[in-house]
Amino acid sequence: MTVMAPVVTVDGPSGAGKGTLCKALAEALQWNLLDSGAIYRVLALAALHHHVDISSEDALVPLASHLDVRFVAEGGQLKVILEGEDVSHEIRTEAVGNTASQAAAFPRVREALLRRQRAFREAPGLIADGRDMGTVVFPDAPVKIFLDASAEERAQRRMLQLQGKGFNVNFERLLSEIKERDERDRNRPVAPLVPAADALVLDSTEMTIDEVIARALAYAREILA
């Protein structure tokens, strides 16, 4: 019988701190890392690199099925490696974002990427960061964490992040955008953003990131022991 590599899933809304937590867990456990939110952007960039017709589902499916991508947590940073090249910054451009949205609209592309995400499950284990990792992608994961925080706290964190990059931001507008996205994510008909029934729900509103990491790591080690 094949023993599947263990998976720790971390789901939650935008701005809850999933990325930071997952990088820390991957480094602490020395496990593989999957950033599911970046995978559509990686596909979009690969399509642009290979001059694949982004409006053709038939052309995108084989590319999605054989996407050569790795995620590497290094010194608290996430590196996205596409076909051996670091594309961490390139995937964040507006052109790639727009292309990613188009690709995500195709059901067969989503199905191909679902299989591709499951292929990240390799020894010694996988940390999976997303919105439906514990409910759809890895429903049998032994450790499931749902990381949440109030919309106000997430807007505050995002504002500080953007200000740190030199952007002028309006808190009320940010808060409104986050609430709208939450509403959309929680009420969508396919894979809504909800905690898995067996997930540990962590509310990080009043916690420091170090406290979140310590709590999640202790929980994971307890289950995996």
UniProtKB/Swiss-Prot annotation:
Reactions that this protein is recorded to catalyse: CMP + ATP = CDP + ADP; dCMP + ATP = dCDP + ADP
Pfam families (alphabetical): Cytidylate_kin
Main localization, broad class: cytoplasm
Annotated TM spans: none
Positions bound to ATP: G12, P13, S14, G15, A16, G17, K18, G19, T20
Disulphide bridges: none
Entry keyword Cytoplasm: yes
GO cellular component: cytosol
Keywords recorded for this protein, A-Z: ATP-binding, Cytoplasm, Kinase, Nucleotide-binding, Transferase
InterPro entries: Cytidylate_kin, Cytidylate_kinase_dom, P-loop_NTPase
First and last residue of the signal peptide: none
Cellular compartments annotated: Cytoplasm
UniProt entry tagged with the keyword Oxidoreductase: no
GO biological process: nucleobase-containing small molecule interconversion; pyrimidine nucleotide metabolic process
CDD domains recorded: CMPK
Assigned EC number: 2.7.4.25
GO molecular function: ATP binding; CMP kinase activity; dCMP kinase activity
Recorded family membership: Belongs to the cytidylate kinase family. Type 1 subfamily.
NCBIfam families listed in its UniProt record: cmk
Protein's name in the database: Cytidylate kinase
Organism field: Pectobacterium carotovorum subsp. carotovorum (strain PC1)
Gene name for this UniProt entry: cmk
